[in-house]
From Swiss-Prot:
Quaternary structure (record): Homodimer.
MF terms (GO), sorted A to Z: protein-macromolecule adaptor activity
Signal peptide feature range: none
InterPro entries: MecA_C_sf (IPR038471), Neg-reg_MecA (IPR008681)
Domain notes: The N-terminal domain probably binds unfolded/aggregated proteins; the C-terminal domain interacts with ClpC.
Organism whose genome encodes this protein: Staphylococcus aureus (strain JH9)
NCBIfam families noted in UniProt: PRK02315.1-3, PRK02315.1-5
Family indicated by similarity: Belongs to the MecA family.
Protein name stated in the entry: Adapter protein MecA
UniProt function note: Enables the recognition and targeting of unfolded and aggregated proteins to the ClpC protease or to other proteins involved in proteolysis.
Ranges of Basic and acidic residues composition bias in the record: 118-128
HAMAP family reported for this sequence: MecA (MF_01124)
Superkingdom in the source lineage: Bacteria
C-alpha cells in the first residue's frame, strides 16, 4: 500500500488487489461483507495513522477511484467547526456509514454491485446441485464459446437474435476471459443448434474449455437468459 500525505487534513493511498488479498481479504468479501469491509478499512486507517500520524478526529470524507490494478482512496478530515464538535461515537458512526457507501460501489462504479454479487452467491450455491444434475444432462447437447472481453459479451447481447433464451445458459469468467455455455435439449433440431452457434461465432470464439473445467475453476457470473441480464446491467457499447 502506498500512502501520500496531501496536507494536514488529507491523505491519499493506493492499494493493489494483490496487496488486498495478501492482507487476508478477498475482493468479493471486501465489497459484500460489511464486517470484513469495516475491518479492512479500519486496518488501513491504523496503518495510515502509524505512518503519517493521521489521527481520526471527527467526521471523515472518503472518495474512491477504482483502477485496473487497484483502488485509490482519498481521506480528508472535516474542516467544518460545527462538525468537529461531534462526539467520538457520532464520528465513528458516520465513518462506518461512509465505509458502507464505499462498499456499495462496484470496482467500475456500477450501482448494482450488491444485486450482482447476491446473484453470484446463489449461483455458487447452485453449482453443487448442477453437478448432481449432470447425469440428467446426458441427453442434452452443450456448446461452449469464449469472449475476449466484456465488450464482446455486451455486443452479442444487443446485436444478436439469440434462440438461446429458450434454453439454460451460463456465463463464466476465469483468468479474465468470459466463457458462455448453452445447453440444448435432446429434442432441439441440429439446425437450430448450428444457427445459434453461428450467431455466437460472430462475437465469440471456439474454445477447448469444457463445462467440467469451467464448473471446477471458473466463476459463474450470470445464468438463465444471460443476454437479457447483460442488457439490464450494461448499456449498449458504441463504436
Amino acid at each position: 500500500m502506498r500512502i501520500e500525505r496531501v496536507d494536514d487534513t488529507t491523505v491519499k493511498l493506493f492499494i493493489t488487489y494483490s496487496d488486498i488479498e495478501a492482507r487476508g481479504f478477498s475482493r468479493e468479501d471486501l465489497w459484500t461483507n460489511r464486517k470484513r469491509g469495516e475491518e479492512f478499512f479500519w486496518s488501513m486507517m491504523d496503518e495510515i495513522n502509524e505512518e503519517e500520524d493521521f489521527v481520526v478526529e471527527g467526521p471523515l470524507w472518503i472518495q474512491v477511484h477504482a483502477f485496473e490494478k487497484g483502488v485509490e482512496v482519498t481521506i480528508s478530515k472535516s474542516k467544518n467547526e460545527d462538525m468537529m464538535n461531534m462526539s467520538d461515537d457520532d464520528a465513528t458512526d458516520q465513518f462506518d456509514e461512509q465505509v458502507q457507501e464505499l462498499l456499495a460501489q462496484t470496482l467500475e462504479g456500477e450501482d448494482q454491485l450488491e444485486e450482482l454479487f447476491e446473484q453470484r452467491t446463489k449461483e455458487k450455491e447452485a453449482q453443487g446441485s448442477k453437478r448432481q444434475k449432470s447425469s440428467a444432462r446426458k441427453n442434452t447437447r452443450t456448446i461452449v464459446v469464449k469472449f475476449n472481453d466484456l465488450e464482446d459479451v455486451i455486443n452479442y447481447a444487443y446485436h444478436s437474435n439469440p434462440i438461446t433464451t429458450e434454453f439454460e445458459d451460463l456465463l463464466y469468467m476465469v483468468d479474465g476471459t468470459y466463457y458462455y455455455a448453452v445447453h440444448f435439449d435432446s429434442h432441439v433440431d441440429q439446425e437450430v443448434i448450428n444457427d445459434s452457434y453461428s450467431q455466437l461465432l460472430e462475437f465469440a470464439y471456439p474454445t477447448d474449455r469444457t463445462e467440467v473445467y469451467l464448473n471446477d475453476y471458473a466463476k459463474i457470473i450470470m445464468s438463465h437468459n444471460v443476454t437479457a441480464q447483460v442488457r439490464r446491467y450494461f448499456p449498449e457499447t458504441t463504436e
